[in-house]
Amino acid sequence: MQVTVEKKEGIHCSLLIEVPANEVDSIVTKEINKTAKTIKMDGFRPGKVPAGMVEKKYGEQIRMEVISDLIPQKYSKAIQDEKLAVAGIEVELKENKKGEPLKFVANLELFPEFEVTGFEKIEVQKPVVELTDKEVKQMIENLRKQLATFSEVERAVQKDDKVVIDFVGKRDGEVFEGGSANDQELVIGSGQMIPGFEDGIIGMNKDEQRTITVTFPEDYQNKDLAGKEATFDITVKKIQEAQLPEVDDEFVAKFGVKGGVDTFEDEIKENMQRELKFILQRKVKDQVFKGLREIAEFETPKALIKREIDAAKQNLVKQMGGGQNFDVNQLPDNLFEANAKQKVETSLILDSIIESQKFQAEDAEVESLLDELVQAYEEPEKTKEQIKKNDREISNLKGLVIENKLTDWVLSQAQVTEKQEDFFEVIKENMQAQQAGF
């Protein structure tokens, strides 16, 4: 086999591969003879079909099957011999004739080689959240609201009421798509609608009609509406008042608390502290990773981005309960491209730093992280044993330990400032980020 490496711009190169004719033809001949022993053909007994007739009728098909198997073997050997780190490959068949060498080109996209420097340029705003009894009591109040029952009342709408409304949204006097609904249930103050919408309903009475003006957020998912002003014609059809349950043993049992009311507040606080810790870690990590992407300079392999896009499509279809008959190719790549590129770049950067700094996860560190994570479960020890039997879960935990070490290492060199934040705002932002798929 003859291999010529042709370097191209950036992370691209080509392998011009030539396989001797006698090697290819020998394999094809063997396959033809093997086929002749098993194929059925009119006028011949099984196993007695002449190889020449098999070649005449099926020779091209057999040759293409041989070539399809041979090409990956040959370019894999060439890649190994040349010690190339390949991210993606496309093959062009150049010559494929009996009695002549097989010639093809393997166009390669390589993993980029780069070094990350300039960590001192990264800016991170570290959120600081004070968790007091006030926040704990507010959380318990929120839990009561989750289990609230509602009864109809004859008065004006107040905060925390559940209303049934019809509404029609308009831009410049024209009804816009997706901006209207009938018999929509809405809890006032839930934040379900865009800012200003729910406040605009407060004070309305049953059967009253009102037109309100609101502005869509700049980051609204529909870019045609983002930052734009709109009006909504609203009709209130029903007003219901919330009745909150008492905080008693029956109430706390619904949230898996076994110690009754006496331990409820302590458990709620522990859960809040645990959730807050992981959310704040995630917020800091996201800033660190964003900063790393900004300082790192390299070309991102398109093959890796495409692979990530395909995986995101499959995950979305699975989450939405899509069946096997759904063609994921119907989903346009551009919906997933930005996130896919971000994920690939982050992964390449982290791998580069981990290799250069030789970060590792010690067994004791993995065990400590596992102990912390399982506290969120009803049966921590049982959950811990189940996870320890799952190699994939343990591998993920090791990755998380290393990721945490890397983050701390970058933070030690970055420009870090602190910012006071509200617990419930942090939780809300985290939920919005998860819903947006980030």
UniProtKB/Swiss-Prot annotation:
It is found in: Cytoplasm. It is an enzyme of class 5 (isomerase). Residues 160-245 form the PPIase FKBP-type domain. It catalyses: [protein]-peptidylproline (omega=180) = [protein]-peptidylproline (omega=0). One of its GO terms (molecular function) is ribosome binding. Its EC number is 5.2.1.8. One of its GO terms (cellular component) is cytoplasm. Its main location: cytoplasm. PROSITE patterns: FKBP_PPIASE. Pfam families: FKBP_C, Trigger_C, Trigger_N. GO terms for biological process: 'de novo' cotranslational protein folding; cell division; chaperone-mediated protein folding; protein transport; protein unfolding. Keywords: Cell cycle, Cell division, Chaperone, Cytoplasm, Isomerase, Rotamase. It comes from the Bacteria. Consists of 3 domains; the N-terminus binds the ribosome, the middle domain has PPIase activity, while the C-terminus has intrinsic chaperone activity on its own. Belongs to the FKBP-type PPIase family. Tig subfamily. NCBIfam families: tig. HAMAP family: Trigger_factor_Tig (MF_00303). Involved in protein export. Acts as a chaperone by maintaining the newly synthesized protein in an open conformation. Functions as a peptidyl-prolyl cis-trans isomerase. This is Trigger factor. It comes from Francisella philomiragia subsp. philomiragia (strain ATCC 25017 / CCUG 19701 / FSC 153 / O#319-036). The lineage of its organism: Bacteria, Pseudomonadati, Pseudomonadota, Gammaproteobacteria, Thiotrichales.
